[in-house]
């Protein structure tokens, strides 16, 4: 009787868990097309913004596009 219980447990519980593809197993679809069209400068800005870092410019090139100005 115990052997039959083990066999039922394996086939009814463990086997379906091993064969199911969970969401974590699926490849993530991120907007790959859109990200390939982004220039390296824009990509850097996105990453810096996500990391919470500021983009600083050298003093002669401060035109308002950067967050801070530093002297060289």
From Swiss-Prot:
The keyword Cytoplasm does not apply. Pfam families: Conotoxin. Disulfide bonds join 56-68, 57-66, 62-69. It comes from the Eukaryota. InterPro entries: Conotoxin. Its main location: secreted. GO terms for cellular component: extracellular region. Residues 25-54 form a propeptide. Keywords: Disulfide bond, Neurotoxin, Secreted, Signal, Toxin. Residues 1-24 form the signal peptide. Expressed by the venom duct. One of its GO terms (molecular function) is ion channel inhibitor activity. The cysteine framework is III (CC-C-C-CC). Classified in the M-1 branch, since 1 residue stands between the fourth and the fifth cysteine residues. Belongs to the conotoxin M superfamily. This is Conotoxin TsMLKM-012. It comes from Conus tessulatus (Tessellate cone).
